[in-house]
Amino acid sequence: MCRIGSIKSKTPVPPSMALNLMLPQQEGHDNSGFAMVMQDLEGVFSHYKDKPLLSLACTPEGVQLVNDYMEERGFVQVAQWVPEVDKRPDLKINAMPRYVFRNYDYPEEYRTRSQKEREDLLLDTRLELRALLAEKQNGFVYSFWPDVLTLKEIGDPADIAVYFRLWNNDGRLTARNI
């Protein structure tokens, strides 16, 4: 069963605010997972709002495939956040080996192109990366867009929050829209 919550705030808030919306809805949860989209990011992403942010979960081989693909197409990585996960064995989560959130600079030839051309590039790139990782089950690309972070996982939402330390309000991961 799906539960939906949303927060839009004038000041940046941590994911725990959205997670608290789920607490009254826990009865009957089937452990099918948790998805979170954050927009208007602050914290570790505050200086990269105009840079496309790639959100992915993958194997080590998937990381290498993404690295090679992005380099071949002229994307330059400018920032990265890799969550420090809690790997307790009792957590009900179907975790991937790697979770990566990277900001990139556009390829040189796209830096002066129209907004529409850059948006088309990001959409096409996400779809190509998705197909590349799916080919040998090396992972999932959730989003590739400026100032948007997407995190998804299968399992108990409370355990997923513990795994990604989303209950910690350390200021590193905040947004105005969750």
Identify the meaning behind each predicted range:
Residues 1-178:
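N-terminal segments that mediate ammonia production and transfer
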